[in-house]
Amino acid sequence: MHRILNIAGNEKNKDDLIEQPAADFIFITSVKADLNLISNLLLEKEFASLKNNIRALEISNLNSSAQIDNYLLKTINYAKVVVLRIFGDKGTWNYGIEQLLNWQAVNKKRKLVILSGTVDQEVSLSEISSIDKNIALNISRLLRSGGMENYRKFLNCLNYLKVNETLIPDEFLNISFYPDPYLYDWKIEKGEKIGIISYKSLFLANEIEVNEKLNLQLR
C-alpha cells in the first residue's frame, strides 16, 4: 500500500510505502513534536514560500529497507536539502543513513544535514553531514533547545543551506532561551489569581492545547 502525504507522523505504520510530493527540503525526525512545531509555523505568512516546498516525516514510517528505498526513489531523489534528526547513534538507523550518504555523494550540490537529539551523539552525527560540522552542531543545539522561536530560526536556515550554509546569519543560529519557570499566557487581570502548573517540555513542543482550553474556561 502507498500513502502520499506532505507531513507524515507515525500512524502505526508497519508495511506501507510512503511517498510525498517532490520538494526542495526534506525533514526526517525521530521526534513527533518536531512535526507539530513545523506544521504550526508553516501556517504563518513568513513561511508562505516554504509551505509547499518542504516535506516532513517521522522516521518510524521508514522502518524497513523497502520503505527507505521507496521513499528515496520517489521523494528524496528530487530534494536539494535533507535534514535527518535522530535519537541514538549511527547504528540506530544504519541503512537509512548509508543510503542518504550515497544519495549526497552522487551530487555534491545536494546537502545532507544529520542532527542528534542528544548531547552525547551530537559530534559523531554532525561530522558526517555534508555541511560545515560546526554549523550542523549549532542547528542540532537549536532544535534540542525547543520552542517555536528556535524552530522558526531553523526554518529560516533552510534556504541558506540550499546555497551555502556559511551565509546563514548569526540571528538564525543564536539559541533563544526560555526562562524557567515560564509564564505562559499570564495576564494582569481582576479577580482571584489561578495558576496552572504544567511541564515546560510541553510548551517547548507547542503542545499547549489543553492549557489554552483550561485558561479559557477559568477566565
Predicted regions and their residues:
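An N-terminal assembly and electron-transfer interface module characteristic of large anaerobic redox
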Residues: 1-219
